[in-house]
Amino acid sequence: MRDRRHEAGQALFEFGVTLPILMALVLGVIEFGYALFQVQLVTSMAREGSNLIARQVTINDAEAALQTMSGLVRFDANSTLIFSVVRLGVGGANNNVPIIVQRHSVGAFAASSVLGDPPQSAYQGSPDYYAYDPDNDGSIRVSGVLPNGFTLTPGESVYVTEVFTQRTSIVPFMPLPAMLHASAYF
């Protein structure tokens, strides 16, 4: 018969060696799942925002709905929400040029819209944030590209919601993106 007293020490040593590897694996799976959840949440918020403003809900009401939608994405220093309505200009210097006729952003997170960043002073205030001079103000022109080569026709509107947020991390050593961005075009 063998003496099992020496084997108990070996098992404890093997457990001590494998425990950090198993913990890293478990925490990595949890972090990756949490990151996927955050991506899904931001995408869902962008889609819901565009859905609301496409149904002629005021931008203020859409903003309030999105702020109550999630406790994880708060539109403060860590997140930004941008609502835009894009149309073709109907006259003046912006005739047949895609322009942002309505625009409102919430939050202080440094983010740039894919459509461009016209000054907030070019737009009226609450509740709908219409452009003051959509026919002649060159600063409200779309400077980015619309998705998939989308072209506007006269009288057509594209409702865009963009959500930018700083991703929160459970495990700091995972090389996942620090910023999440989602946009929805309706």
Where in the sequence are the language-model features?
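N-terminal leader/signal peptides at the extreme start of proteins
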Residues: 1-8
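Aliphatic-rich helix starts adjacent to a transmembrane/signal segment
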Residues: 11, 16, 20-56
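Non-catalytic, surface-exposed connector residues within folded enzymatic/regulatory domains
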Residues: 36, 60, 77, 174-175
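Extracytoplasmic beta-strand-rich oligomerization domains located immediately C-terminal to a leader/signal peptide
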Residues: 53-98
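Soluble periplasmic/extracytoplasmic beta-strand elements of cell-envelope proteins
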Residues: 82-85, 160-162, 183-185
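Intrinsically disordered, low-complexity regions enriched in Pro/Ser/Thr/Gly and acidic residues
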Residues: 89-178
